[in-house]
């Protein structure tokens, strides 16, 4: 599988992409949310891990933009806000398939990715 990690924290991006690669996946990262749409045009991916709070363009706005062209692409919101119920509902309403706290370890984040991909695969395709 091919994953995209989008977070303005370069160290966290490097850590997550290295972890995903250690699991046998392709993984790329961007620190600037405004570059995601152009990146997706050239690089198909299976899922995105997307930070909610980024400069230039926040994750919630970015989800709305992604959903215009990539309605079925699994997106996991990644946030330092912890498990705030209101933030989780806002993320889901914006189009996120999952929500993960930055306080979790890489294995838990990986499990969340696999869950949303599993949910995505379970959704019947429109004819």
Where would I find each of the regions flagged by the language model?
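Two-component/phosphorelay signaling modules centered on CheY-like receiver
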Residues: 10-28
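The feature encodes the CheY-like receiver
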Residues: 13, 55, 83
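Acidic, metal-coordinating helix/loop segments flanking the phosphotransfer/catalytic sites
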Residues: 29-47
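Acidic catalytic/metal-coordinating carboxylates
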Residues: 32, 58-61
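Short amphipathic alpha-helix used as the core "switch/output" element in two-component signaling
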Residues: 38, 60-71
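Active-site residues of response regulator receiver
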Residues: 51
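Alpha4 helix (beta4-alpha4-beta5 surface) of REC/receiver domains from two-component response regulators
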Residues: 61, 82-98, 111
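Hydrophobic/aromatic residues positioned on beta-strands within the core alpha/beta folds
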Residues: 78-79
């Amino acid at each position: 599988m091919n994953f995209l990690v989008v977070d303005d924290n370069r160290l966290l991006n490097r850590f997550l992409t290295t972890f995903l690669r250690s699991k046998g996946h392709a993984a790329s990262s961007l620190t600037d949310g405004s570059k995601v749409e152009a990146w997706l045009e050239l690089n198909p991916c299976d899922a995105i891990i997307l930070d909610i709070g980024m400069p230039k363009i926040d994750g919630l706005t970015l989800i709305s933009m992604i959903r215009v062209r990539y309605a079925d692409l699994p997106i996991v919101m990644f946030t330092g806000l912890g498990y705030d119920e209101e933030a989780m509902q806002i993320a889901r309403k914006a189009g996120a398939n999952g929500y993960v706290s930055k306080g979790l370890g890489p294995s838990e984040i990986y499990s969340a990715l696999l869950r949303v991909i599993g949910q995505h695969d379970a959704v019947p395709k429109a004819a």
